[in-house]
Design a protein with these regions (language model features):
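Conserved polar/disulfide-associated segments of primarily extracytoplasmic proteins
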Residues: 41-129, 136
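Stable alpha-helical elements in mature extracytoplasmic
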Residues: 35, 73-78, 143-150
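Intrinsically disordered, low-complexity regions enriched in Ser/Pro/Gly/Gln/His and often acidic
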Residues: 8, 30-34, 109, 132
Length: 158
C-alpha cells in the first residue's frame, strides 16, 4: 500500500511539473498555427515556412483562393506535388471542420532521404496546403513530436 502511494505521489508530481515547450503562434486573417518559440519563420511571397534553427526540416503553409480545382482532382494534385507513382487511394480524405474536406498523404523521398507529410484542406475554391518535410535521420523522438504538434495545431478561422 505504501509503495503504491509513493508511486502515485511521484507520478502526480512528475506530470504536474513536466514542462511544455514554450510556443508562439503565427496568425493570419485565415488561419493560425502554434510552434516552438525557438523556431524561425519566413514569408516567401505568401508561402510560410516554419523551421527549427538547425534547418533539418520545415512546415510549409500555402493558401489559395479562387482556385478552380475540382475535388475529384485533388488527390492527383497532391500526388503530382511529389511526382509520386502511388495510387490515389494512398491519399486519405475525410470531412473536416467548417465544411472543409481534409486530405492526408505521407511520402518518403528515397533520393533526398526525407519524410513528407501533407494535409490539404479544400472547400469550394479555397485550399490550404500544409506540409512537413524532415530529414530521415531526425524523424524520430523529439523532432517528430514537435513537428506533429505544430502540424496538428493548424486551425482555419473561416
Amino acid at each position: 500500500m505504501k509503495k503504491t502511494l509513493v508511486l502515485l505521489i511521484f507520478l502526480i508530481s512528475f506530470y504536474s511539473t513536466a514542462q511544455k515547450i514554450p510556443g508562439k503562434t503565427y496568425e493570419t486573417d485565415n488561419y493560425a498555427i502554434t510552434f516552438p518559440d525557438t523556431w524561425k519563420t519566413t514569408d516567401d511571397s505568401g508561402i510560410i515556412n516554419i523551421f527549427p534553427t538547425n534547418e533539418i526540416g520545415a512546415i510549409t503553409i500555402s493558401e489559395y483562393h479562387d482556385l478552380n480545382l475540382p475535388k475529384g482532382e485533388t488527390k492527383k494534385f497532391i500526388l503530382a506535388l511529389y511526382k509520386s507513382a502511388d495510387e490515389e487511394k494512398k491519399v486519405k480524405n475525410s470531412n473536416g471542420k467548417k465544411g472543409y474536406t481534409e486530405y492526408n498523404y505521407e511520402y518518403f523521398d528515397e533520393k533526398e532521404k526525407a519524410f513528407w507529410i501533407t494535409k490539404v484542406f479544400q472547400k469550394e475554391k479555397n485550399l490550404y496546403l500544409i506540409t512537413i518535410n524532415c530529414e530521415q535521420k531526425y524523424w524520430n523522438g523529439n523532432y517528430m513530436k514537435l513537428f506533429n504538434e505544430a502540424f496538428e495545431s493548424f486551425k482555419i478561422k473561416k
